[in-house]
């Protein structure tokens, strides 16, 4: 079991704990932990549902941020190393 999957909290300053970036940061950490859990326990369907809910919430926040401030969105995607939103 790998314990080093969490992202460094130094990416988010202390004064911005409620910002969209910090919320996406914490949700990404939860996604990484749940993904690791589901690799060990593949048939844990309640955890799968929780993961889907977290991913949905993170996506909503990323859509909001991409509409409000594209530069902050691009910077956050780059720092966290997650895939950007699909565009139509």
Curated annotation (Swiss-Prot):
One of its GO terms (cellular component) is ribonucleoprotein complex. One of its GO terms (biological process) is translation. Belongs to the universal ribosomal protein uS15 family. It is found in: Plastid, Chloroplast. This is Small ribosomal subunit protein uS15c. Part of the 30S ribosomal subunit. SMART domains: Ribosomal_S15. It comes from Pinus thunbergii. Keywords: Chloroplast, Plastid, Ribonucleoprotein, Ribosomal protein. PROSITE patterns: RIBOSOMAL_S15. GO terms for molecular function: structural constituent of ribosome. CDD domains: S15_NS1_EPRS_RNA-bind (cd00677).
């Amino acid at each position: 079991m790998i314990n080093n999957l969490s992202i460094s909290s130094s990416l988010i300053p202390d004064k911005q704990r409620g910002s969209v970036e910090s919320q996406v940061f914490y949700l990404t950490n939860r996604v990484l932990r749940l993904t690791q859990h589901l690799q060990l326990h593949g048939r844990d369907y309640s955890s799968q549902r929780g993961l889907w809910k977290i991913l949905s919430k993170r996506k909503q926040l990323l859509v909001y941020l991409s509409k409000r401030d594209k530069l902050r969105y691009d910077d956050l995607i780059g720092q966290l190393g997650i895939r950007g939103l699909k565009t139509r």
